[in-house]
Amino acid sequence: GDWCKPEDGVFGMNESPRDCPQIECIPCSFYGNQPLVYFYPKLAMSTMRAYINYMTYDGAAPWVFGGCTARSEPSGARNERHLPTAACAMNVPCRGYQTTTNGISFVAMADRLWVSSGYDQEILKELYPWVKKNTIYTMTLRAEEGPDGVVSMPTGNVGTEWFEHCQWKGIVAHVGGLHLAQLRIAERMAEESGDKNFAAMCRMWFDEGSKSMEKHLWNGRYYINFFEPSTNEKSDLIFSYQLDGEWITDFHGLPYCFPKDRVQTALATIREVNSRHSDIGFLSFLNADGSPASGGEGVMKDWYDPFAFFNAELFMLAMNYMYEGQVEFGLPLAEKCMNSIVCKHLHTWDMPNMIRGDTGEVTFGKDYYQMLMLWSLPAAVKGQDMGGPTREDGLVTRMISAAN
């Protein structure tokens, strides 16, 4: 369309050329676009402008620009007109089946461009209206449930989230935290844009969602996986990556996502139950007694290996510990994972998506740019927000200076 300027073009990353060929799968870019923002911000802005112009009329961020999972239905049902799309298609966007978490991926990437630019007001002016539009869409996906809906799966529990091969129902710890983080980002942008009314709405949604999670999910040791109020069905599994929302607020230099004492207690629980199973990473799901959750049953359905974890998620969890003052634990956790991938299993230029925590063997994925999440670690090691490395004497500033 006319929005695509010759000087911009459309820049997009391929999720995995050999295993999942598609352009700009939005959670993959959430995990992996930080070095683009640091070193090639014009390319990152080109991608962001495509996300904006591919956004649906009601505010849904696009799932992909095109490729092997191009689908039009949040349920995951394929639309036949999308099936022939090439792996490198750039003009067949759809809202996909992770609608409840596509929003934080989009909003976080927008905020990265703004924060890393030194809070450039022109960038804020261009991006904020779309952050607002998507935030309204995301927070009303289950509007009929009132405050609980802010931290719940969409109406009817339709679709899935980043951990897409699992059951998610009702109020969900992982989704809830991501939504609360999105509200923190949107509130700051609204305040800086002079949109006081929307900033107040974000605070209201945040307060309501936070109270709902504390009431229904906190059990004294961790946030249980999910609770469906309409049926009283719940999953009390320990989801090791339940604090992703907290990492986002830390990395973006924002106030807490979860109460501080809850974060510290949950991290201690997650560390304790995983220590007996793996030296190189944390299992995704464990039973309440700390044993590995069985694959093929209940929440895990039939896809994830009980000992498997996503490497990019492990890096975020390692940074959770760093931001809580435990650099001596968090940094070696990330290092052990990379040592296993690169030195033991020799995937130096072939970054996998998931590995087993007990053996380090790859369970899925080749050439995954999610692994560029590594570029978020320098800020976390120093306890800085993402803008730290771009400031005077920061790592990114020094690298660019050396290259010039």
Q: In which residue ranges do the predicted regions lie?
A:
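Active-site core of glycosidic bond-cleaving carbohydrate-active enzymes
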Residues: 24-56, 129, 176-177, 181-192, ...
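Aromatic-rich carbohydrate-recognition surfaces in CAZymes
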Residues: 9, 18-151, 156, 168-193, ...
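Glycine- and aromatic-rich loop/turn segments at beta-sheet edges
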Residues: 2-17, 58-71, 81-90, 140-167, ...
